[in-house]
């Protein structure tokens, strides 16, 4: 009995020793982390994370004459974004932020068009290219890795504004849809006519023609609600065509314009 009791006491002592060691290491790690944050703060560095959602669209500017009317628009599902960033403050007002962001940019639209460049996939899997007059439904679901580099200006203790360029890399892509209630003239507006009426539709998919690298401008504002929590809004405006240079089915350039809204945490 004494031997068993002694073994139990030894186990308890070992457990207590392990717990004390873990607690000590955790406390040391926390202290080092706090010291690192304090050092960064004293040297003008600030780190943060953001999480939000995006709403907007991919559109030509201005709307070309081929697009006669926008019949409907929807965000195209939940489009989330996650970002980590570092800010260097040069003085009490001015600073610069570099970030890395994963962002979804979606939309779904329906439009009435006339002589709109189109390459459709017919029922037997073949392609027909020409000019479409009628209804067009477009679905865009793209995911990007984005690197913004923006200048910051503190308007007050709680408010700051930012502006600067960004570059992005396309990770997942989808630009597709279908045409309905209209006709296709091939190869041009004086060519043979193919009609689609009632439930007859034809699909298209331009996903493989999307450009991998894009760039643009970002303009934003941020309000610090609490010591570490803030609310932000960033508008991103693409400045180069989303399609590759050799893609000529659609005769005009299209640009991604999205508003990203969410919450951030400053360490």
Model-inferred region functions:
Residues 28-48, 92-93, 115, 175, ...:
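Outer-membrane beta-barrel biogenesis signature
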Residues 29-87:
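Short glycine/proline- and aromatic-enriched beta-strand/turn motifs that initiate or cap beta-hairpins
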Residues 49-55, 98-104, 163-169, 233-237, ...:
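Transmembrane beta-barrel strands of outer-membrane/channel proteins
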């Amino acid at each position: 009995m004494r031997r068993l009791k002694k073994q139990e006491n030894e186990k308890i002592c070992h457990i207590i020793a392990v717990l004390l060691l873990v607690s000590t290491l955790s406390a040391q790690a926390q202290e080092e982390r706090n010291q690192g944050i304090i050092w960064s703060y004293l040297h003008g560095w600030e780190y943060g994370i953001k999480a939000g959602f995006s709403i907007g669209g991919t559109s030509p500017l201005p709307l070309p004459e081929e697009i006669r009317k926008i019949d409907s628009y929807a965000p195209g599902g939940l489009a989330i974004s996650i970002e980590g960033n570092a800010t260097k403050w040069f003085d009490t007002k001015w600073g610069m932020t570099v970030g890395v962001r994963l962002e979804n940019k979606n939309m779904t639209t329906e439009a009435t068009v006339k002589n709109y460049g189109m390459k459709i996939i017919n029922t037997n899997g073949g392609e027909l290219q020409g000019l479409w007059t009628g209804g067009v439904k477009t679905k865009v679901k793209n995911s990007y890795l984005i690197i913004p580099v923006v200048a910051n200006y503190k308007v007050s203790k709680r408010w700051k504004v930012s502006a600067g360029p960004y570059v992005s890399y396309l990770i997942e892509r989808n630009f597709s849809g279908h045409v309905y209630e209209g006709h296709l003239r091939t190869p041009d507006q004086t060519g043979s006519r193919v009609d689609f009426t009632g439930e007859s539709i034809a699909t298209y998919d331009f996903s493989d023609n999307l450009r991998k690298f894009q760039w643009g401008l970002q303009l934003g504002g941020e309000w610090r609600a609490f010591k570490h929590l803030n609310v932000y809004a960033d508008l991103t405006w693409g400045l180069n065509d989303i399609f590759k240079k050799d893609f000529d089915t659609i005769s005009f350039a299209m640009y991604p314009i999205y508003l990203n809204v969410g919450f951030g945490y400053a360490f």
